[in-house]
Amino acid sequence: MLKMGVVLFIFLVLFPLATLQLDADQPVERYAENKQLLNPDERREILLPALRKFCCDSNWCHISDCECCYG
């Protein structure tokens, strides 16, 4: 009788709780899709700090950390 109670507890309580954790991934995916809709200038402002590069004049394009922006 105790074994049946443990099995029921696992399937009726613990299993549904474990599957609810998987639903938390959806807002992150939606946020990533929204980021793709940004215009190129906004994307550049987000990506350049992430890549640890910066915008500079065309005279400084030889620097490895420089991302040359013509715009």
From Swiss-Prot:
Residues 25-52 form a propeptide. It comes from Conus textile. The keyword Disulfide bond applies. Keywords: Amidation, Bromination, Cleavage on pair of basic residues, Disulfide bond, Secreted, Signal, Toxin. This is Conotoxin tx3h. GO terms for molecular function: ion channel inhibitor activity; toxin activity. Belongs to the conotoxin M superfamily. The modification 6'-bromotryptophan is found at residue 60. It is found in: Secreted.
